[in-house]
Amino acid sequence: MDCMITKLNEKDQFISKIKDSDSKIGQFYHFDAMQEKSYSERLSMSNNGREVALAQVIKNYMSDLTLTEKQLQNISLLSEGAKVIIGGQQAGLFGGPLYTFHKIFSIITMSEKLSKDYNTNVIPVFWIAGEDHDFDEVNHTYAYNAQNAKLQKIKYHTMTPPEASVSTYYPDKAQLKDALKLFFKEMNETTHSKQMIEMCTKIIDQYDSWTDMFKALLNEVFKAYGLLLIDANNTELRKLEQPFIQKIIEHHQDVDASFRNNQQNTIANGLEQMIQTDTNVHLFLHEDNMRQLLTFKDNQFYLSKSDKYMTKEELLKILEVEPERFSNNVVTRPIMEEWLFNTVAFIGGPSEIKYWTELSEVFNTLDVSMPIVLPRLRISYLYPRTEKLLSQYQLKQHSIIEQGIEKDKEKFIRAQASQTFVDKVEEIKVQQEKLYQSLLTEVAGNNDNQLLVEKNNHIHQKQYEYLINRYLLNIERKNEISMKHFKELSETLHPMGGLQERIWNPLQIMNDFGIDVFSPSTYPPLSYTFDHIIVKP
């Protein structure tokens, strides 16, 4: 395998501004990601004293997995105070989109770099967002059917989606296996398919909850790197979080005020508003089998789905006895994560690193230091077949990754068409426009006749446009094979109008190039970069 770096002209310049240490953005982070002193300062910061308990929670959480020596060593190092690089993601079906794996590679790459540069131990940690309850975001994935050059949506169907967190959801194993069968049916059958299906089936059989299956898959792929995993909704973890949840409850008005003020400042500085929330408590409570957002009104805490009010004392009593019933929202989750871990840097997707700018004051209010914030690596896979087509049509990969294929496709069709034919029709259109302008002069003052002429002109102009479009469509149909090639390029490099990593599933890459394609022995060594990486399997 090989990899190369390419620069894309991005519409959104946010990541470029971080790279350039833009002060308008930098004022909302606690550290400049581009300054070496930021890393040395984070690495030398005092630990929070929770590392022994946290390491034990992670060890217990991962006890149902087959761990490598490196993972066991990292758990031990974590308990001794080793700093971490951290990032997280929702538990997507069959691993979710490729960018989940790329986020993990970003965490691993940065932890290895800092360990080497500073001659210390920096541990890679992946945070599974198991407390989320929006099942529609994780219940599907896509498989690329090379024969039809088409992406097929694969969905796990259920009549009873979880009302609470996905980590407490136990999917129907037979239906999950049906989805797996459909997933592999869409893809090419390769020498790796049987082994892949066996691995996934074994995970479905061995584990019960949605996030445990996700955890097991990630561990299979990344255990050799020493990656540690934790579910944000883990019961033992929630017990450890208990005092900080209490602090959020007791200071919820200050937390909300600092968040709202911070958000207004980011907007005033020209940044896009990222977090939309009506709550003023920024915590969820599990009540009546539902994960419900707490709101403070009429001097009490209110649950809208259950239409219940609670006093602060009642809420704190629940926290004392059943802390696992509480969970964080988008505002408090990052702060909780950093309260737990001794973090050097948080690595997030483009939207995540944006919404962290809205939390700077919340970190201060809760006396937690915001770590360095970095964007994850962005990676596309260039298949040999794709490379061959690019060469055949003399196209640039970075152009398609960035803008899609439509302009190149239109250029190809026009090249096969008679430009004389198109020009003559365009000429007729211009001549007719002039003719109708003279007709309008003849009927000036008669509103009905003016409307009649304008309408008739419009009909004729439409007919000429139809003639050109239909002519080009016939050219397109005549070049059916080339059109399929263009579709292939689109679905592989710019699927559904965006980056490959946002749509494609990592199991597709494993099915095509081997179950160990993401392992240290096969995957090319990565260097952290703000630019786009192209991997050639």
From Swiss-Prot:
<comment type="similarity">
    <text>Belongs to the BshC family.</text>
</comment>
<dbReference type="InterPro" id="IPR055398">
    <property type="entry name" value="Rossmann-like_BshC"/>
</dbReference>
<protein>
    <recommendedName>
        <fullName>Putative cysteine ligase BshC</fullName>
        <ecNumber>6.-.-.-</ecNumber>
    </recommendedName>
</protein>
<keyword id="KW-0436">Ligase</keyword>
<dbReference type="Pfam" id="PF10079">
    <property type="entry name" value="Rossmann-like_BshC"/>
</dbReference>
<dbReference type="InterPro" id="IPR011199">
    <property type="entry name" value="Bacillithiol_biosynth_BshC"/>
</dbReference>
<comment type="function">
    <text>Involved in bacillithiol (BSH) biosynthesis. May catalyze the last step of the pathway, the addition of cysteine to glucosamine malate (GlcN-Mal) to generate BSH.</text>
</comment>
<dbReference type="GO" id="GO:0016874">
    <property type="term" value="F:ligase activity"/>
</dbReference>
<dbReference type="Pfam" id="PF24850">
    <property type="entry name" value="CC_BshC"/>
</dbReference>
<dbReference type="InterPro" id="IPR055399">
    <property type="entry name" value="CC_BshC"/>
</dbReference>
